Amino acid sequence: MTRQRRSSGYTLLEIMVVVFILGLLATIVAPRIMGRTDEARRTKAVADLAGIAQALNLYRLDNGDYPTTEQGLEALVERPTAPPLPKAWRAGGYLDHLPADPWGTPYVYVRLAAQRYTLKSLGSDAAEGGDGTAADIDAHAN
């Protein structure tokens, strides 16, 4: 009695079908995942801006006003040395560190008239203005 030996493995046709199905899935799924990256970055920027705005409000409560444009957001991490000096700056600061926006650009802070400021991320293009993912993301204090 002789046994027929069958080799194990996949046929070329089976491999081609699997590759085709994987390629089809990749073309459907990839665009959806890629679009989520920009959405996630914008969401992170909004969250960062909210955290920085909260720290700015705490600074104002302690010192009577927001930091000047010249003092900038660094006044939330290290005690300002340029006038007007803070009256009651918290030991340890208001933030551990200044985050960069999700595109690696520093957030922009400008102190406006009495008790007001503008705070923003310049978006993916790191330039003023823009559309879509390049649009600026703003946070304002009334």
Where would I find each of the regions flagged by the language model?
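Alpha-helical hydrophobic helix detector
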Residues: 16-32
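Aliphatic-rich helix starts adjacent to a transmembrane/signal segment
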Residues: 32-50
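Short, surface-exposed interaction loops/tails
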Residues: 3, 38-43, 54-57, 63, ...
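Conserved catalytic core of two-component sensor histidine kinases
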Residues: 19, 46, 53
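N-terminal leader/signal peptides at the extreme start of proteins
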Residues: 1-10
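Short, glycine/small-hydrophobic-rich surface segments
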Residues: 56-97
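Hydrophobic single transmembrane helices highlighted by the model
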Residues: 11, 15-16, 36
